[in-house]
Amino acid sequence: MNTTLPALRSTRRSRLGARFFALVVALAAFVAVDTTAHTPAFAQNIYSIYSAFNGPDAPVPEGQTAEDVENYVGPSDFLLDKAGTFFYVAEGDAGRLRRVRADGTAAAESIPLPFKPNKMRFFPGETKLAIVGGGHKGRLAIVEIAQASENPDAAPEPLPMRVVADYPIGHTPSDVSVKRTDDGRELVYATLQFENAALEIDAATGEIVRRWDVGREPFCAELTPDGRRYVVAGRITDKLANVSYSCSAVRVIDLDANEVKKTDLLNGHNLLTDMTLSPDGKFAFISAVQGNYLSVTSQVSGGWIAENVFLVVDVETCEFVEVFFLDDEQLGAGNPWGIACSEDGKRLVISLAGTDEVVFIPLERVLKTLADRPEWARPGFGAYMYSSFATGEVQLPIRLRVKFGLKGLRQTIVRGDDVYVLSYFEDAICKATLKLSPPYEYYPNSYVSQETPPRLLQTDAENADDRPDDSAEEAAAFAKIAAETASDPNAGPPLRFVELEPRRPLKGVEISRSFARLAPKPVLTTRRRGEILYHDATACFEHWQSCVTCHPDARVDGFNWDLLNDGTGNLKNTKSMLLSHETPPSMISGIRADAETAVRAGFTHILFKKADEKNACAVDEYLSSLRPVPSPYLVNGELSESAKRGKVLFESDRTGCAICHPAPYYTDLRLHRVGSQDVNDYIDAFDSPTLIEVWRTAPYMNTGGFHTVRELLLEGKHGARDGRLDKLTPQEQDDLIEYVLSL
């Protein structure tokens, strides 16, 4: 075996003895909150809160106009046809589908979609698209885009785009794949994030042919090239948090046998975001985060709290195989997102949404690393292998990082030497081209740094609006074209790629960079700036993590963390940020008086980089704008009959639930002693959280010790240690639980 073959970890710090250190514990006094002094900002029931967000008259933040709020394209996915002629862009914020020539020689075309799109795939032959989206009212649209050419070797001939079918499929579709069977049937495979399900759908009728339980929050999925297996990755852990082993899971559905296999990942693997398969379909590569939740959050250096990785799963056996680290020793690769392979199997490319970078990886060397693993190596062995450049010959580094500076880099496409990356926050497509001219000669490091110290290539969060500017000439040309197409709502400007300075990480390697706007450079509202900052790992010291590392979608990651604000050794379950600014105090222990205080403390003590007040206020604005996602337990947006009965019980003296959890926020904003104190806790009273969206915030309580609301109420006797819930009939217990899960 070639012992010099590197894995993707540059120099892994030794952890031997690293957890033995002294800590200073500050004791905090708790201040009672006057509930009468806090005036709710929303209407008096949770259903009007839903409609305020999901209805046509969504609230506009103070000081902004509706035009500001709705003026983003927000591309959520894109495809490039096999001929390399057309990009198809799903405009997640604008609710449209765009087709634009890749060479920039013609204006774009677009059509409105019946919902806001999330993901899409070509049908075989590239004459149609399958598009899923729509959030809690999830749908599948079939869009005709072309007709097959009479010449079987020629590309399809474009047609005016039109929606030919639109089917309801379930709550929050998160990914989609398509296949054509031997008998000519077209089947669509989709995952439903908040129904924990995968679907097989007949594209001709919209009928759901098969449905599988695939665990918590399936977020990304791929169909193997032979169409026999469907690989599904859960976004966050589905395990208890008060344990020493917690992680997300990957499942493989054998479509022929109709069987589902599951593999757990390594401890701490979470936030699985995107997936691609090796060209032969043998391996699934998944972008993810390694959460070191057993560490005290006393520092962030060297990935102490979180590291950034991609995972390898054997598709046929459904076994976890390996983890490869994307970080460098003193510079994290925060929040990996899009991941894609080249068709020739030579290159793997990953976008880093948190650091505005793209990572080039020689896929052949990854596969060789896997093939050369000794038989005795356990899964994850490569996590502890050092990157060491070959001494006999100069090779390409296993990892090349190139900075774009555009925010929200997400979905990725690889075509030969060209890489395209979608920039969600910039309404843009980025392009990088890798040019190799061996022999190679190393510069001192593997960064795309040329003669500039690598740290200077990073964009600090203090300048979140410091993004690449279009040249005056390009901006004028863009404005002219935009004006010419403004009268036609279905037209748009052509792609005009603006060249950025090329990067040369080592002699013999050049990476050209450019980007093309889908619309004029977005004018950021305060709320949008806050959203960008929340996703920005450059706001963190050494760029290891962002707020979404522990709070995806500003909700929960399912882990317990040991924050220093209330001592050490007493881990607490991650809280959702939903309504945090409306329901003080903050933190489970109530240690922060309000969310504004918590936001500023989070920058200082979790990201270890102080934010200026302007940026902190922007994050406040973003978090304050969050609205609940309607529960999957609702029926057509309303309480079920069971939940209606449960509501009566919830508000009655028989249960007393509404004493601590009164509407409209389902919290009295106070600390309570409910018997949930852990042996390591310094306090015995904890914040009464909002129950809104409690259906998605498991595991429950400060300890994260209950999988379900049923376990919490009936086994944990939460708030009912006198046994009052035991006196309910089984039907009444079911009704009460149904209501709580409907909030």
Protein language model regions, located:
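Beta-strand-rich domains and repeat architectures in extracellular enzymes and scaffolds
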Residues: 63-95
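Short, solvent-exposed loop/turn segments at conserved positions within beta-propeller repeat blades
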Residues: 92-93, 135-138, 193-194, 240-247, ...
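Periplasmic c-type cytochrome electron-transfer domains
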Residues: 273, 286-287, 291-298, 306, ...
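A short helix->beta-strand "capping" segment at the edge of beta-propeller domains
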Residues: 42-74, 321-325, 389-405
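Surface loop/turn motifs at the tips and blade-to-blade linkers of beta-strand repeat domains
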Residues: 67-71, 110-114, 166-171, 211-214, ...
